[in-house]
Amino acid sequence: MSRINTNVSSLIAQKTLRKTNGELQTTLKRLSTGLRINSGKDDPAGLIASENLRRDITSAKRAITNSERAGQLIATADSALSQVSNLLNDIRGLVVEAANTGVVSDEQIAANQLQVDSSLEAIDRIAQTTTFQGRTILDGSLDFLVSAGGTNGVGLDTVEDLKIDQANLGTSESIDVSISISNPATTAALSVDANGFTNNALNDDLVIKLSGTDGTEVFTFQQGATVDDLASAINLVSDATGVEATNNNGVLELATSAYGRSAFVDVEVISEGAAGTFGDNLSGTREIGTDIEAIVNGVRASGNGNSFSINTSTLDLAVTVDPGSNTAINFTIGGGGAIFQLGPDVVSNQQARIGIESLNTGQISGKEGRLYELRAGNGKDLYADPSGAARIVDEVITKV
């Protein structure tokens, strides 16, 4: 009988040893890395899910970091704005002091003007030197770029002020803005028709209290005072009441200088002689203005006087137009702004694109004018027009 010698037992033992060693290596690798899946052979489907999850976690961490850095940039800008606000309030105080010409000497006004100029230079310096990680943020380089584009590219000449806080420009890097004004803002107005006078003059003595947006005054007129006399007296203190008067062919018209529902005119006849007809021909005792009504890219805007604004997920802007204007406006936002990536996916709905306006005194302005006009030798310095200077500073303080 013949015998066949084999090494099957050894082969089986080697196979078992290799398997055991492989499992040991896998176990040691899992223990050392803390990961169940270290390669595709461990769990192909699980590896794909694991890598996707790791990608999402990494992206989310970066998004959180981006949000923190965006907050740091805003905090830097806010700190600079606080300094500018303090300087503007100092300028406002200097303007008020310089207006007290009854006791303030020319030398004191000159000293105040020098201090105003110094404060304006400080504001310009802040605008040019405020940086975040080497990038200047208040010089206008992060503002949106606006051009007379849109459907017709018209109406921008009627815009007194345009502020774009946020815009989603999408992949085209531009957005057309179309604005239609259905109802322009109006002033508050009252009138006394010609029947309230005889030959354009009062029939009897008259005392009235006139109240407007800015204050109240009491007027006393004698019999025979003309419509022009009444208008002149009212206009003499129009800055205190906010109401202006005109003689329109014998009709005394009273209207606020301000527009919108916050503007009002109120006339109370305190006393009038028996022969007087002023009160009987007054069109009313109180009237208020109306706010502008506008549609921006199909969205109804919120109106306030001659200003209106919208705040949507794709566009956040505020516009101020010429008083009473109803001209359609079309323009294009074609780039600019600071982009903040706030989500894990690089898509527009997970980004914020914010416009940061320039704080330069030659740029920042309101309907009354630009801040640089307060410098010595310009039209709104402390010598030429302290009242106008105060109005400009008030508007700029509101914007800042």
Segments (PLM) and residue ranges:
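Primary detection of the long, small/polar-rich alpha-helical "axial" segments characteristic
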Residues: 1-400
